């Protein structure tokens, strides 16, 4: 605490500056467009990946990357989203429900948020904007993973010692939960469970970090780098205990430097309330706060 009463540590961010996207493969672009754009009200990126081999979906300053593959990928946990109007979201989801019949799609309003499952089984929890998400009005504030019992503490140590990102370890209903800070209004959450966890299928997330070489050196030394993508990017999959080397969890990280050419690119978000019957001139785009 400083002399003037400010706790400067509350403004620390850590080495991971932002989570940029979550990547899951999908087998059907038309279904994905119906769910992500018409249902959730998000926006297909008009500048990148506009062909049938992939689609990028914008959500504030973050994205979903959805490569077209025969086998869909399912994240082992929950993807958190913030949206400005949950009532409008509910109406959109009800509208697209008949078009998603026969898939794993479901939606349910519960305790101030909306729980949604995509056509292939990915789970989303959608919140209204609030102080727990900073000034984010539309975006991807967290991803929560279900992890084996006895791993949450070691996962936190990995992020602190290897990735240089601060974390907290708490108990929630007698379950250990690690929360890793990834930028000013985002986090990765690792919640222990006694239930069986599906085998990892290759989905990934992308982060930007400030100290790019330090984590790489540690990962390289321990033979954990899985791809040397470019001068600005590398990848790893296994999260290990930094002291024992025991594998704790698998989730591919696409690690980008703060000099990556795509950092800060303009991400367009449409206003999903616009329609032909009630069109408002000059309100096509949605102004977001990261």
List PLM regions with ranges.
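Short acidic-aromatic low-complexity motifs
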Residues: 26-30, 147-152
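Conserved active-site tyrosine of GNAT-family acetyltransferases
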Residues: 32-37, 121, 155-160, 219
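The conserved glycine-aromatic submotif of the RRM
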Residues: 72-77, 197-204
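An N-terminus-focused feature that recognizes amino-terminal "leader" regions
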Residues: 6-68, 75-78
